[in-house]
Amino acid sequence: MDSSGYNSRMANRRSPTTAADPALLGRVKGLVRQVLGGTPADVYLFGSWARGTQRPTSDIDIAIESAAPLPRALLASLREALEESTIPNRVDVVDLAETDAAFRDRVRREGILWIASGSA
């Protein structure tokens, strides 16, 4: 390492943050549970937060899967609650019923089942 710390700083810039903040994710999960209430749906955490490669400014990606598309009012309420919360990261919400099969398969394969149907 050089005396200026340059090499260390550059390594930190390239390296993803690997430890997900459990308190932050817990707040997101709690808000999702609250808004979904008894809606029968599976909720997946996917993307960089699920892989553990997120950075401090990375958005949090969640996907909701139910037998039928979720009511637009419910999705709007969830998005609004997340935007108005004190959660510092943007949270992207995807209704899997509105996506193509390849995307759904990727979320199911690579994502983490965060909330199981009926436990919201």
What are these regions (language model features)?
Residues 61-63:
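Short, well-ordered beta-strand segments
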